[in-house]
Regions:
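N-terminal leader/targeting pre-sequences
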Residues: 1-216
């Protein structure tokens, strides 16, 4: 059951046999207009192997480009998991009108799990700016858990409790001139595609099978 095709029919099959369920209501960041939701579920195979399956559906994204997306998480001073949150405009330290990726770090934390397909490829949006993504990750495979930004390695234990974690989507087209004289990815020199800029985020919340199936159907 773990190695499912990347389709909503296959994910429905996974949900019906899953042990735990979570959902995410993705909210727009940086005036992107992005909307969407995500589902997460865990299934335990007969041999004890556990898989995390994640589906993301989003609209309002920059069309026809690959979008980075991750599960992020924060830790306290002792290294214990803390509650990540969606950044707000008050996190815009350089006051250029954009909460850039590093400015949001205190809110959502480091990348714990990059959300790519089985070949490590980022998902591509359609020409209408929509995206659907489904992928399974073996929780016992530590190679799944790392940050391409900080270089830190993580494990599935760092992902827990899942309710403390955040999903963040990136990539926006931003015209030249915005943020001129400031640092970060919006510094006035950009002209179009900005791969790092966060465009949507949402806190992971617990749900149940019936609600998860309803979200999938919608």
């Amino acid at each position: 059951m773990a190695h499912l095709a990347s389709s909503f029919a296959s994910y429905e099959t996974f949900l019906r046999g899953a042990d735990a369920f979570w959902s995410v209501d993705l909210g727009a960041m940086n005036n992107s207009g992005v909307t969407g939701d995500a589902l997460l579920s865990v299934n335990t195979e007969e041999d004890g192997t556990r898989y995390l399956n994640i589906s993301i559906s989003a609209a309002g994204l920059t069309p026809d480009v690959r979008h980075a997306q991750h599960v992020h998480g924060t830790f306290d001073a002792e290294g214990n998991p803390s509650d990540a949150r969606m950044p707000v405009i008050a996190d815009d330290a350089d006051q250029d009108g954009f909460v850039e990726v590093l400015e949001g770090l205190a809110a959502y934390g480091d990348i714990l799990l990059p959300l790519t397909d089985g070949d490590g490829v980022l998902p591509m949006t359609r020409s209408d700016g929509t995206m659907n993504f489904i992928q399974s990750y073996e929780l016992g495979d530590a190679s799944n858990f790392f940050s391409p930004v900080s270089g830190n390695d993580y494990t599935a234990a760092d992902l827990m409790p899942v309710e403390n974690r955040e999903i963040v989507l990136h990539v926006q087209s931003v015209g030249s001139g915005f943020g001129e004289g400031t640092g970060g990815e919006i510094n006035g020199s950009q002209d179009g595609y900005v791969g790092l800029l966060p465009v949507a985020a949402g806190e992971i919340e617990g749900t149940n099978r019936a609600q998860a199936l309803d979200i999938l159907e919608d």
